Each structure stands twice: as structure tokens, then as C-alpha cells.
Regions:
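Short hydrophobic helices that act as membrane-entry/anchoring signals
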Residues: 2-21, 85, 89-92
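Helix-to-loop junction immediately C-terminal to a conserved catalytic motif
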Residues: 14-46
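Catalytic core of membrane glycerolipid acyltransferases/transacylases, capturing the structured
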Residues: 34-100
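Residue-level preference for the first positions of well-ordered beta-strands
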Residues: 39-41, 117-123, 158-160
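Short glycine-rich anion-binding loops that position phosphate/pyrophosphate groups of nucleotides
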Residues: 46-48, 125-128
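A cross-family acyltransferase "interaction/gating" segment
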Residues: 130, 134-203
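Charged, low-complexity C-terminal accessory regions
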Residues: 197-240
Length: 240
């Protein structure tokens, strides 16, 4: 599928979704007019396989960049499902089947991410949150180190964060058919990658960049919670 036809597909998804769901969306800082220099898209608070619903809130200029150069991983179990895997492959020019291990699948994803024009998407918690607030193994929803590796690798452009209010009220893992005509809560934040890296270096020890990124993103997730999450009353590092 070429970029134009994929863009048309994404626009159709957006229009259909907006007839079914209402969106409560906030831009924490100024909403950009275009996303040509956006290199990294981070989804925080991963709760459902129905997160493509968020496309209903994406600006058309963002959809165009996704249609041309988006690269994102999908869990191998999800990727291998005939219908679901096919649908997820329609959303981007390159979709990578990823295992839970640092193996060849991760190396392949990183190789694609290194390409000059790539627009990388990642849900850095790795697993979906269940109704009890934990992952399917009963573990806390912590940020994994892979996102810090990607940030280290990038030397220009912007990072766009989507803070999800959660989709358990629409469809929780294992619950089947999604509920219709609900409100979707989300926030966006965008900032310069190099400024972010410089800030993380300043607030961390020499060899603790990864830990600083993980801590900061977890605080941002908690601070920018919406109705399905509880705020922790903490402040993330301000990016100037």
C-alpha cells in the first residue's frame, strides 16, 4: 500500500471513529501545525488492543507523516493473529513483530529506527494494563529501557507523547467486543529530543541516563493521568 492510499485509509478510520466516540483531548504545550520533524511517538498507559481508536484525535498532518514513514512494533502473539495482525500492518509502512526478549526482532526494529526518515512508535510499558492496574503477570506497569535506547540513538527532531486515559471502559484485555459511544480521554505533549536528552543528562549521573528517562516518563504518565488513572502528585522534569 502506497503512502497516499494508507493516508486515505487512516483518514477513513479517523472519520469512522469520530462518529462513534467522543474525544476529550488536551495539548499540554502548543499543538504544532505539522509533524515533519517528529521522530518518536510514545504511547503511555497501554491498556487495550483497541488503541487505534486514538487515530480519531490525530491531526491530518500527523496522519500523513504516519502514512509515509511510521515504524512500530507489535507483540509477536498479536502479529501472528490472522485478522488482527493484518489490521495492525495497515496502519504503517513498516510493522515489526517483536518478542519479549532482546533478540533479532529487537535488533531489526532498532535497525529500522536508525533509518534517517523513520518516525518511530513505541508503547514503552511493553504489556497491557489489566483491570487491576497490573500487567497479566501481576507486575507493575513500569517503563522498559528500550525507549531510552531509542532516545539515545536519535540526534534531532521532536518526541510526541500521547498520555492515554485508558480504554478499559471501552474494551479491557480479554473482554471481547468494544463498547460504543463512550468518551476517550487523552493528552499530547511534544518537545525537542536533544533538549530532552540534555535535561536527562543534567539530572542523572554519568552512567544513569536510562534510569533517568524511565523515571521521568513514569512521572509524566502519572502526572498527566486522566479519569481512569490516579495522579501521584509528583512532578516530571521540565523541558525548556
Amino acid at each position: 500500500m502506497g503512502s497516499f492510499f494508507r493516508f486515505c485509509f487512516l483518514v477513513c478510520v479517523k472519520l469512522v471513529v469520530r462518529t462513534i466516540y467522543r474525544f476529550d483531548q488536551v495539548w499540554i504545550n502548543s499543538k504544532p501545525e505539522e509533524f515533519k520533524d517528529t521522530k518518536l511517538f510514545v504511547l503511555l498507559n497501554h491498556t487495550s488492543l483497541f488503541e487505534p481508536i486514538f487515530i480519531g484525535a490525530f491531526p491530518y498532518s500527523l496522519l500523513w507523516q504516519m502514512a509515509k514513514r511510521f515504524v512500530y512494533p507489535v507483540a509477536d502473539k498479536t502479529f501472528s493473529r490472522p485478522l488482527v495482525g493484518f489490521l495492525f500492518r495497515l496502519f504503517a509502512p513498516q510493522t515489526v513483530s517483536l518478542t519479549r526478549n532482546r533478540d533479532n526482532s529487537w535488533e531489526h526494529f532498532i535497525a529500522l529506527a536508525k533509518e534517517k526518515n523513520s518516525f518511530i512508535g513505541i508503547a514503552p510499558e511493553g504489556r497491557m494494563k489489566r483491570l487491576n492496574g497490573l500487567d497479566k503477570h501481576g507486575m507493575p506497569m513500569n517503563i522498559k529501557s528500550g525507549v531510552a535506547d531509542i532516545i539515545k540513538m536519535l540526534d534531532s527532531g521532536k518526541m510526541l507523547i500521547l498520555y492515554s486515559g485508558g480504554l478499559h471502559h471501552i474494551q479491557s484485555p480479554g473482554s471481547g467486543i468494544p463498547k460504543l459511544f463512550k468518551k476517550v480521554h487523552l493528552k499530547f505533549e511534544i518537545f525537542d529530543i536533544n533538549q530532552y536528552k540534555e535535561t536527562m543528562i543534567k539530572v542523572s549521573d554519568k552512567d544513569e541516563f536510562t534510569r533517568a528517562v524511565i523515571s521521568d516518563l513514569q512521572l509524566r504518565r502519572d502526572m498527566n493521568c486522566t479519569p481512569e488513572a490516579e495522579c501521584q502528585g509528583k512532578l516530571a522534569v521540565k523541558i525548556v
